[in-house]
Amino acid sequence: MRKSRKKFFIPILVIVLLAVSVYGFLVYWDNHGMITKVDSIEEVAEYGATDFFPTDYQDYNNVHFVKNNRFHLIFESESITMKITDPEKFESMKADIVDKYGENDFFGNEPFEYKSKVFRAVTDGKLGYPKQIGFIGISESEKTIYYLWFYDFDLDSIGDMEDFVIKNFNQTI
């Protein structure tokens, strides 16, 4: 009788441990994703983000790209962060943003601040909101411009823009 219980208990224990491990792995990837450094916008061209980012980024002194893939149960999302730090060209970069987007090409026209950067969501018609969305952040103190791009084919709504940026870009800003 005891042997049959032991034969039954061990497989159940193994199954439970495997299920907990898989669940932990899925929760980790959902919250963290896989962050990779990207050397140029061409490496992320397949994601359709090239129209959002400035095409003259090679002209700036300090440009960094970071891509974050987050895997959910049956779908994935990608976020790309472009950080441009060039104090000498900072004012002209801001002017380029106004030239490209004006004052009205932003969702709700409501900027929000996160980590001393002022962000706005872009309503550029080429982005298929909410599945694709871009944010532009400006840090006056760092003389830095951030371009944040997000894609998730399964996303139906975003909610609060600040919470969205914190959830999806906190590790790359």
Protein language model features and the residues they cover:
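Short, flexible coil/linker segments at or flanking structured domains
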Residues: V16-L17, V22, N68-R70, D124-K126
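Generic intrinsically disordered, low-complexity segments enriched for polar/acidic and small residues
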Residues: R5-K6, V20-L26, V44, T50, ...
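Extracytoplasmic electrostatic interaction patches
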Residues: S92-I173
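N-terminal export/targeting and maturation segments
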Residues: V22-K100
